Curated annotation (Swiss-Prot):
Gene3D superfamilies reported in the protein's UniProt record: Complement Module, domain 1 (2.10.70.10), Thrombospondin type-1 (TSP1) repeat (2.20.100.10)
Keyword field: Cell adhesion, Disulfide bond, Glycoprotein, Proto-oncogene, Secreted, Signal, Wnt signaling pathway
UniProt keyword Glycoprotein, yes or no: yes
Similarity comment: Belongs to the CCN family.
Pfam families: Cys_knot, IGFBP, TSP1_CCN, VWC
Protein name according to UniProt: CCN family member 4
Cysteine-cysteine disulfides: C49-C73, C53-C75, C55-C76, C62-C79, C87-C101, C93-C115, C273-C310, C290-C324, C301-C340, C304-C342, C309-C346
Domain TSP type-1 residues, every copy: 215-260
Amino acid sequence: MRWLLPWTLAAVAVLMVGNILATALSPTPTTMTFTPAPLEETITRPEFCKWPCECPQAPPRCPLGVSLITDGCECCKICAQQLGDNCTEAAVCDPHRGLYCDYSGDRPRYAIGVCAQVVGVGCVLDGVRYTNGESFQPNCRYNCTCIDGTVGCTPLCLSPRPPRLWCRQPRHVRVPGQCCEQWVCDDDARRPRQTALLDTRAFAASGAVEQRYENCIAYTSPWSPCSTTCGLGISTRISNVNARCWPEQESRLCNLRPCDVDIRPHIKAGKKCLAVYQPEEATNFTLAGCVSTRTYRPKYCGVCTDNRCCIPYKSKTISVDFQCPEGPGFSRQVLWINACFCNLSCRNPNDIFADLESYPDFAEIAN
């Protein structure tokens, strides 16, 4: 076993030399020194609301077209900030002009912003995206419009009443090669016959029509329900009573009842409804910061406490002139309510397809 001793000593010597060389050649480890970064100054947001509220005795007098609203602190009446004005938690933008406070330019405080215009959102129908305000035709029978996330459609195929005099048994049938249905009489089924024509000579004599258009079928659809159950809304209809005899959409403003007035206390004892409510004083109509040139004392539909809906029964359309603080004035058609009644048939005014449910091919809108 003596012959193993030299070899063992040699191996130990080689290992020791290797460790010494590795230690000598390896870089000296550096010590990492972490220096803490200086802390940023604490961001302080100014406080624009003070409690308890301190309001002036009289509300401010706002310029013509500027809304008088409650401030963001829910304390005092202020004149709403307009487009491009600075806005804060207290000084809010004019909601009647579709403005909101954009704080993106005041990072990272987000305390003072600028009043900007609200941009309506688009719509998606059958996987196709449409921008706000865009009109499109999903098929040849309907024309649709995207309005702030909601799609509203109007039928393009106008269906006048069937003829009563010369047609014995009228039938509403599809015609090959045409999109819309037409009235057909059994006495002459080989070719479709039109309904009673609009006598344009009477309109020409009154100056309403400058040129006579043959084969013009006069049609005016009923007004759609008001888009809101309270406050300012809009209703539409389709009519081709014009010089071109072309179907056009007409609109009018509507206000069934005020949102900020509780009509229920006005119901007499023992009664279940109040058909008509009328304010005591005449006021001006306001629209997008513009004010009507004259005052009105309109009638509003009341409320029913027995699950019935109070809707207009007799009404008409009037023209109201508005004056704006900047720029020329304009006129709008407005619903004028004469009488209301409580009806058991209640429907959601925002259901834009409610009037189409009675159509046999209602499902074609989504095809």
